């Protein structure tokens, strides 16, 4: 039945949205920052293509009804019935388009967050060493994430180099915080000295100095 494929796509988008929100809440509760990696399930390329084919079929049906509504083969039908068929066909076609746009918009929003939270290096951090993560993106999504990250990097390296555009919009509740190192990150230079971030060690540091490391999963706020 027309519309069933689009309904499957929307259900998949809703599951992705709910899963993302649950992971965000878990990340915030753990104090380790919001980890945006490995967020997206695999892109349903075949399902999207089938919906596009269905839209094309509906378009041809609508054109046929519009151009042949008064033909002899429809003479035995009431004019209102033909118009109703035409209208319902258009509704099905538009609904499929809206479902496709909603699916793409959700995935694009997540890709935008990945790029911003990783200072424009989203594609490198997203792919990492795990090929499954890269394979979850379509070819066009990989290109989009790469080029969007390049735009962010270019923007931050020019007139706004002194402003942390990717920083949190919420003011910190504490200037200094206790953090635990979740994985080795080497030495970092701050205004208050050098810290050697070794796994399982703890430090009392200024939050603004380590906020990026918290978001990237190197540190956890205690």
Swiss-Prot record:
Keywords of this entry: DNA replication, Nucleus
A GO cellular component entry from the record: GINS complex
Keyword Nucleus: yes
Example GO biological process: double-strand break repair via break-induced replication
Compartments where located: Nucleus
UniProt keyword annotation of Nucleus present: yes
Main localization category: nucleus
CDD domains: GINS_A_psf1 (cd11710), GINS_B_Psf1 (cd21696)
Family membership noted in the UniProt record: Belongs to the GINS1/PSF1 family.
Oligomer status and interactors: Component of the GINS complex which is a heterotetramer of SLD5, PSF1, PSF2 and PSF3.
Protein name as annotated: DNA replication complex GINS protein PSF1
Organism: Candida glabrata (strain ATCC 2001 / BCRC 20586 / JCM 3761 / NBRC 0622 / NRRL Y-65 / CBS 138) (Yeast)
